[in-house]
Amino acid sequence: MNPPIILKIFNLACILVLCTYTGFAQITLDLEGGIATTGYNDVRIPGDGGTFIGLADELNSNPFLFGRVRLSYTFNERNTVSVLFAPLQVTYDGAFNRDVNFEDTIFPANTPIDATYKFNSYRLTYRYQVLTRETVTLGIGITGKVRDAFIRLEGNELRSEKTDLGFVPLINFHFTWQFSERFHLLIEGDALAAPQGRAEDVLVALGYSLNDQFDILAGYRILEGGADNDEVYTFSLFHYGVVGVRIHLPM
């Protein structure tokens, strides 16, 4: 799956909701970037027989740049449909102090290792604004998330990779508090926990309205989650320092 496909889904959703459009409508473009770091990235593949490794603890990693883009369509004031493309790819290097079984390949102790962790996320969201006050809004919705992921280890002519393409539903939420004429607090995200695993992607940010069309944001995002089953054990945590801009285009 790639960005053009998710945009086609968004266009289809917009066509469907336009059929019921009777009033206010707005397009919003969110552009987000900044610096991120790994909190932890723990892996055991296969889940029932591989070696437990902490990529961030046992190998070297550096802060990395990131970017995200989201396109939203709000209609009838309370309904919002959006698509998000959130790529993530991190590299680690170093050596393990023991033999490592990863995806049925044995990497001997002290082998120079290059590890790559990719977790691209494509999401389609519908949200309904359940609370609208003069200074406070709250929206609740559902997100369909497609993950395109892999974990790869390579070193000394050895190479092993575990790929994953899957779908998971999440609960979406969006809260704003307009505490002054131009400043607002924003808390939004997608999250869900189940016996098979969990996922949380939450942003807390301070927003400043330049005018009716442009907002700038600065804040903190946490991305955490993983799965635990016979095939894989993988849980990761990433911290994001976020800056962004939101462009509102009335229709």
What are these regions (language model features)?
Residues 75-77, 130-134, 177-181, 210-212, ...:
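Outer-membrane beta-barrel strand-turn architecture
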Residues 25-88, 244, 248-251:
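Short glycine/proline- and aromatic-enriched beta-strand/turn motifs that initiate or cap beta-hairpins
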Residues 31, 69-73, 124-128, 142-144, ...:
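Residues on the lipid-exposed face of transmembrane beta-strands in outer-membrane beta-barrel proteins
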Residues 183-197, 222-223:
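Transmembrane beta-strand segments that form the barrel wall of outer-membrane beta-barrel proteins
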Residues 198-251:
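Predominantly the C-terminal beta-signal and adjacent terminal strand-loop region
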Residues 39-64, 87-119, 148-166, 174, ...:
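Extracellular/periplasm-exposed beta-strand and loop segments of Gram-negative cell-envelope proteins
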Residues 134, 165-167, 190-201:
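Solvent-exposed loop/turn segments connecting transmembrane beta-strands
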Residues 27, 78-81, 134-136, 181-185, ...:
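Repeated loop/turn-to-beta-strand initiation elements of outer-membrane beta-barrel proteins
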